[in-house]
Swiss-Prot record:
Belongs to the CinA family. InterPro entries: CinA (IPR050101), CinA-like_C (IPR036653), CinA_C (IPR008136), CinA_KH (IPR041424), Competence-induced_CinA (IPR008135), MoaB/Mog-like_dom_sf (IPR036425), MoaB/Mog_dom (IPR001453). This is CinA-like protein. It comes from the Bacteria. It comes from Koribacter versatilis (strain Ellin345). Transmembrane segments: none annotated.
Amino acid sequence: MIAEIVAIGSELLTPFRQDTNSLYLTQRLNEMGVEVAFKNIVGDSRANLASVARTAIARSHIVLFMGGLGPTEDDLTREAVADALGLRLKRNPDLVAELYKRFASRRVTMPDNNMRQADVIAGAEIIQNDNGSAPGQFIEGEQDGQPRYIFLLPGPPHELKAMWNEKCHHTLRDRLPRAYIATRELRISSLGESTVDARVAPIYTKYKNVDTTILAKPGEVSLHLKSRAATMEQAQAAVDQLAAELEDELDDAVFSTNGESLEQIVGYYLQMRSGTISVAESCTGGLLAERLTNVSGSSRYFIGGVVVYSNQMKTLLADVPPLMIEEHGAVSRQVAVALAENFREITNSTIGVGITGIAGPTGGTEDKPVGLVYIAVADELGTDVVERRFPGDRERIRWWSSQVALDMVRKKLI
């Protein structure tokens, strides 16, 4: 059984308002074993909304319309869904009385346009809104021998969440066959999206009862696994079995099998090994320290960090010899190593990290272009240093650099 979510409001098609309701309802539906197959955002047009509603009702068993139930002329969800269903709106006298009562309790005269909130699609069940003036509606029907469950929900998140949790969730759950969804997320570093897919596709395509989605961002690839079954044990067993096979194939490139971030994993290993870490950063400007300290409890292992942006600070705070900078340049393998080793010694930490590079958009040369970064990680056994040439803008280069640094630390610890 699949669901479709339709978010309504022209403001959601601008950069100024985000649709957070869809994320919330997707999570709640997944908990019930329902897959959300489609999401739509529609502006305040009766014709456009009616067209989207017809398509949604034709292809999805469960359709949730969010927003457009207010009193103003651009609140058109009731009318558009009625158009799509070929039904009429009827003004409900009980809702009219409730509206008058609500406004009277506030000693406010009710505007005439609020009466529109008492209009109900023929045959719909009214869903009381305890947190606002716009009631929801529920319509149960059938199309081509398949059930249809249609909800009209208010747009304000606090109203929608309360209405769903207290009323709609139970209404839908009582009508659904029992199903459970289990999920796992594997997070991978050091490998690109196409490389990961080439290696794991022969494995995950064998699992017809598990949906696998691959997502990529700078320095990381995620495999999202989802299985639906009659019992939670069956669903969990399916994703666990596939996750184990994928982890065997990708080996230490997998840094998390339950969705933890790279900085969380590094923190876990540092605590497990009673280790500490300090960082001396140039081009990342403190981003690595920020990511490490975003983890709760990081004070147990994070000693400190410095942003040594200028050559003077590299010497003053991390003991990088001026002659080394003059001979090799501030962006060099030698300086990255000196930052890591010297700051580790200064802070008496078990691991030191040094990063130097050119984040751009200016400052690059033919020999040392924008995106060139040197990253060094030092411990008592020695120092690893890498040269990377990252693509993208300043923000992307800084993120890539911090991601590679964290992964180098992780591999030192495992």
